């Protein structure tokens, strides 16, 4: 048995299948950790979701910004962008099935894994963990969002109110909607921030392109860090899968942009990649 963290698939179905063949994935024994953005921008969002849903019992999934964007469009709460590739999925006879499944996924997942060099705690989110968050902060933020998304009475209200760049930092008296919008941005959109968690959400380039006064979230001292904790994230293709920090693992290697889809085996830190073919 092995655990593999998989980078942003974004509808690159054939590359996903090729990567799984390369690692000899066995759904009866292995686990896939999908870092979010399963769909959109790539050529085959429908077949990607259809396939992952079929093997869902062998998958741990966290939601990315594109997955949440899809849910909002599917509820007629948000209009598609011209570059979206969600039409076939939105017209699928199984649309409600896939919506409900995605709504019940997490924004954060963690597990203790026995590795070749000892026990490690792997924690996965789509975009990262802001530097000022403790373990409890992260758990509470993710759980509040999951509870809203999975609740038939609350999820439309959540999806209607999460878009926007403000508030851009934690404040003691934020109302529930503002708090969830900020925390959704931390978990699914963050790249650059300040040490107190103040976000800058416009810049998308490499760390050397950082806005004045901001750093990549992982280059700040992280409150959540401990000796056995390893963080896995996607979202930031411009990093090319590198943070230069041993216990912070970037796994988005830009498949949808013409580069490659990557898998990181948790037990021995080996990386496998499959080049973009479509």
Identify the role of each PLM range.
Residues 5, 34, 61-62, 123, ...:
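Residue-level marker for buried hydrophobic side chains located in beta-strands
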Residues 1-54, 68:
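N-terminal active-site segment of His-dependent metallophosphoesterases
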Residues 139-278:
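Acidic, His/Gly-rich catalytic cores of divalent-metal-dependent hydrolytic chemistry
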Residues 3-10, 122-128, 250-251:
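Active-site-proximal beta-strand elements of phosphoester/diester hydrolases
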Residues 1, 24, 52-54, 109-117, ...:
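A short acidic-Thr-Gly-centered motif at the start of a beta-strand
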Residues 8, 37, 52, 64-65, ...:
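Divalent metal-coordination and catalytic microenvironments
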Residues 12-14, 40-42, 67-72, 132, ...:
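Active-site environment of divalent metal-dependent phosphoester hydrolases
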Residues 46-49, 54-176:
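Active-site neighborhood of divalent metal-dependent phosphoester bond hydrolases
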